[in-house]
């Protein structure tokens, strides 16, 4: 059975950090070991500022990085934006400022591997960093979505499909919401994030 924790805080880092640490420690603290590669997967869809509330807030990402570092593991923040360059999005969303001075890799997904996500989809190209990470911390952003109504933890793993391959899978599903939902579930189950912390 899935375990769910809810904590209310604002983006004051003195409040956010202990709340975030508490959640991750309770849900996945025993799964993050010293020396492991930990992928932190935020939602970095497109150009936006923290105030736009479209992307995972930079301080949520910072809390994840600091938690991983405290565990002695190796954090990497990555995504594959649908629109625009990863570097510009990181700068516009002030992630570069939040992560300044921290020992973390912050880079877009590039290399891919083929991952079997089951019938009827078969093998799909997934970011190598996601496929080979020891631990994945999924950091989705709570927001509306034209086709799926909401973007939550399951859909955020679709970002592990690199570059324009995402739009190709969107087109294959067309307007069939159920077909696209099944695809999202298949990808989520294949990539298997260790823990999901929803930035709402």
Q: Which residues fall in each region the model found?
A:
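N-terminal and secondary-structure boundary signal
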Residues: 1-200
């Amino acid at each position: 059975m899935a375990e769910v924790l809810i904590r209310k805080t604002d983006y004051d880092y003195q409040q956010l950090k202990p709340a975030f640490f508490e959640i991750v420690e309770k849900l996945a603290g025993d799964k993050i070991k010293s020396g492991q590669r930990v992928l932190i997967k935020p939602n970095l869809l497109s150009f936006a500022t923290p105030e736009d509330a479209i992307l995972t807030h930079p301080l949520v990402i910072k809390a994840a990085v600091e938690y991983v570092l405290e565990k002695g593991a190796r954090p990497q923040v990555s995504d594959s934006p649908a629109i625009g360059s990863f570097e510009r999005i990181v700068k516009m969303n002030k992630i570069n400022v939040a992560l300044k001075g921290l020992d973390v890799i912050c880079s877009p997904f590039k290399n891919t591997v083929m991952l079997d996500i089951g019938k009827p989809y078969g093998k799909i190209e997934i970011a190598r960093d996601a496929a080979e990470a020891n631990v994945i911390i999924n950091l989705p952003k709570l927001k509306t979505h034209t086709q799926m109504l909401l973007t939550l933890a399951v859909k955020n793993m679709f970002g592990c499909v690199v570059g324009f391959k995402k739009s190709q899978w969107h087109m294959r599903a067309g307007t069939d919401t159920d077909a696209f939902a099944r695809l999202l579930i298949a990808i989520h189950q294949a990539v298997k994030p260790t823990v999901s912390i929803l930035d709402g």
